[in-house]
């Protein structure tokens, strides 16, 4: 299986399955001399981990990360950083009834077509459990970006089902189980989630991530545009079916006179482009959105086939999230951080001596 690595200079390679012994990753390209402990990574892992509220899967994994290499006397050495998280709450028996059945809407059918076999226990490698290691690696990038460049990366839920959420107050995001920035909508989200759990169904969501303090000049035209790499990273997250940068698909209804981000001596007058022009960061906030489908792991009966070609009706048993978008927030932050750190290192390697007299805001 290829495709387990992201990045060029800051490279993250993950391994492990949902019901295997452990998850792990190798992080290459971290500069030496950066103070780093397991506690630096644990905060974001705790935000992502399952079983933390009644609105998410009740699989209870502590997700305690172990640093295996690349750290000496509390600082990075510049060598590969190895990270490991043990799986401790597997219930593989929950999946024995579906070992020969393809769950509709899941990767069961496509994995079997590609490899001729699959790990049916919780989806194996296709499970969102894998993203725990992305969050751990992303926490390294977030720390580097914040301490060396003053870059802040934040994410939140901006829609659940047909409930839109305004970014009214970032401080509220960590104060509720939905990562919701709109305190006026908490009760509506709670009511929707209760209804979904009662019905045994699920719902989709929209997540927004914002990076502030990103310098102008990041991005490598033409095939490694910054927005292309961000879209690639976000699309790699489980259940994501669409990504927008800036105003995204809303620009279809705009005219050029409305959409262009005009510039005065005081700076940009708007940010429809989401902080990226021509594939290169403009120095404005980088804004990206991603749409996540409703999970197919539900108890509402549905039609499918088994590996023998027979039609069957099935429900998905086990412990699942009614809305996978909730726990996707720290994952999206991590993926954005990984991309930005990679491009910062690439910019430093090629253009460290570039100086311009063009204003920066």
Curated annotation (Swiss-Prot):
Binding of NADP(+), residues: 48, 54
Any one of the GO BP annotations: chorismate biosynthetic process
Pathway per the UniProt entry: Metabolic intermediate biosynthesis; chorismate biosynthesis; chorismate from D-erythrose 4-phosphate and phosphoenolpyruvate: step 7/7
CDD domains, per the entry: Chorismate_synthase
Cofactor details (free text): Reduced FMN (FMNH(2)).
Highest rank taxon of the organism: Bacteria
Function: This reaction introduces a second double bond into the aromatic ring system.
Family indicated by similarity: Belongs to the chorismate synthase family.
Assembly and binders: Homotetramer.
Protein name listed in UniProt: Chorismate synthase
């Amino acid at each position: 299986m290829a495709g387990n690595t992201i990045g060029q200079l800051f490279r993250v390679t993950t391994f492990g399955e949902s019901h295997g012994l452990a998850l792990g990753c190798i992080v290459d390209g971290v500069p030496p001399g950066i103070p780093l402990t397991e506690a630096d990574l644990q905060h974001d892992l705790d935000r992502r981990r399952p079983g933390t509220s009644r609105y998410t899967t009740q699989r209870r994994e502590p997700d305690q990360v172990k640093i295996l290499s690349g750290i000496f006397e509390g600082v990075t050495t510049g060598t590969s950083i190895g990270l490991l998280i043990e799986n401790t709450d597997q219930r593989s028996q929950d999946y024995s009834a579906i070992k020969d059945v393809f769950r509709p809407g899941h990767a069961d059918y496509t994995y079997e077509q590609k490899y001729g076999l699959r790990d049916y226990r919780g989806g194996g490698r296709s499970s969102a459990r894998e993203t725990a290691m992305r969050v751990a690696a992303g926490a390294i990038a977030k720390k580097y970006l914040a301490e060396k460049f003053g870059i802040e990366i934040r994410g939140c839920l901006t829609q659940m089902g047909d409930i839109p959420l305004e970014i009214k107050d970032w401080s509220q995001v960590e104060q509720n189980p939905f990562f919701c920035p709109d305190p006026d909508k908490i009760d509506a989200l709670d009511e929707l989630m209760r209804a979904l759990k009662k019905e045994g169904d699920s719902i989709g969501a929209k997540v927004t991530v914002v990076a502030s303090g990103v310098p102008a000049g990041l991005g490598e035209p033409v095939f490694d545009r910054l927005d292309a790499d961000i879209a690639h990273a976000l699309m790699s997250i489980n259940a994501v079916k669409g990504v927008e940068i800036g105003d995204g698909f809303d620009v279809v209804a705009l005219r050029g006179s409305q959409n262009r981000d005009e510039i005065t001596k005081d700076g940009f007058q708007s940010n429809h482009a989401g902080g990226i022009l021509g594939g290169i960061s403009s120095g404005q906030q980088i804004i990206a959105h991603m749409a996540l489908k409703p999970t197919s792991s539900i108890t509402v009966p549905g039609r499918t086939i088994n590996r023998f070609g027979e039609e069957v009706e099935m429900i998905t048993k086990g412990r699942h999230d009614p809305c996978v978008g909730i726990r996707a927030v720290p994952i999206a932050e991590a993926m954005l951080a990984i991309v930005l750190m990679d491009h910062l290192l690439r910019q430093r390697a090629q253009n460290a001596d570039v100086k311009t007299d063009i204003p920066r805001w």
